[in-house]
């Protein structure tokens, strides 16, 4: 009986010691602090969102502004600002090399940044529209010059140039130029000067006329001889 009573008493929960009471008290205090921190965090986020909504609204109403740059802020704040901007119909980007320097820029939809402008911000550079326009003009000019040079290289050399370059060291530049002009103008005659062909035909005609006259003269003389002998 005594053994049974002793077993029952030993199985019963022992009253907490002073150490256990202190541990439970600290646990309750820690839970209360965590709850308070969470409530403070929610309150701060709500206040920050409300502040950003007001600033974004003012930015949209100001027709003189195209973009708005914020100071560096934490990841949570950047996330809230991006969300507010999206709801308001704005375009937003984060820039900065590290977490400490990252910031947010807002852009109105009608003034969305170009790829060149975004690249400048990513490099940590200031965007200058005038300098960018000058670089664009120079780039276009260089492209046009390169295209013109390419067409010039592909263009075949003219007969004038070939003839002039080939024979200028023998007959002189002026003579070569005149000869090239003559050949170009009279290509239908097999590149032989037209004057030579005209002269040749005139001589042949003249010789035929001379032969005909000689034959006629000889015939006249023979006729005259026959008449005198009779």
Swiss-Prot record:
Gene3D superfamilies: R3H-like domain
Segments forming domain R3H: 46-109
Region (Disordered) location: 1-45, 119-169, 185-230
PROSITE patterns linked to this entry: R3H
SMART domains: R3H (SM00393)
Basic and acidic residues: bias regions: 16-45, 119-144, 196-211
Coiled-coil region: none
Keywords, sorted A to Z: Phosphoprotein
Phosphoserine found at: 158
Pfam family, one: R3H
Membrane-spanning parts: none
Molecular function (Gene Ontology), one example: nucleic acid binding
Chloroplast is among the record's keywords: no
Protein name per its UniProtKB record: Sperm-associated antigen 7 homolog
Organism: Danio rerio (Zebrafish)
């Amino acid at each position: 009986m005594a053994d049974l009573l002793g077993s029952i008493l030993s199985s019963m929960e022992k009253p907490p010691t002073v150490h256990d009471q202190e541990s439970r008290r600290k646990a309750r205090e820690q839970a209360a602090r965590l709850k308070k921190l969470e409530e403070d965090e929610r309150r701060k986020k709500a206040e920050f969102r409300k502040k950003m909504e007001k600033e974004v609204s003012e930015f949209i109403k100001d027709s003189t502004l195209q973009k708005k740059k914020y100071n560096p802020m934490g990841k949570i704040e950047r996330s809230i600002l991006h969300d507010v901007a999206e709801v308001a119909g704005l375009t937003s980007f984060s820039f900065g090399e590290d977490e400490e320097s990252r910031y947010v820029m807002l852009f109105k939809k009608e003034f969305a940044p170009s790829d060149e402008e975004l690249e400048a911000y990513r490099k940590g550079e200031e965007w200058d529209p005038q300098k960018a326009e000058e670089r664009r003009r120079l780039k276009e000019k260089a492209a046009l010059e390169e295209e013109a040079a390419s067409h010039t290289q592909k263009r075949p050399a003219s007969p004038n140039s070939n003839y002039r370059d080939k024979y200028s060291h023998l007959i002189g530049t002026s003579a070569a130029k005149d000869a090239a002009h003559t050949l170009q103008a009279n290509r239908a005659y097999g590149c032989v000067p037209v004057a030579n062909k005209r002269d040749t035909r005139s001589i042949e005609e003249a010789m035929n006329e001379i032969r005909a006259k000689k034959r006629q003269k000889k015939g006249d003389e023979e006729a005259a001889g026959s008449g005198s002998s009779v």
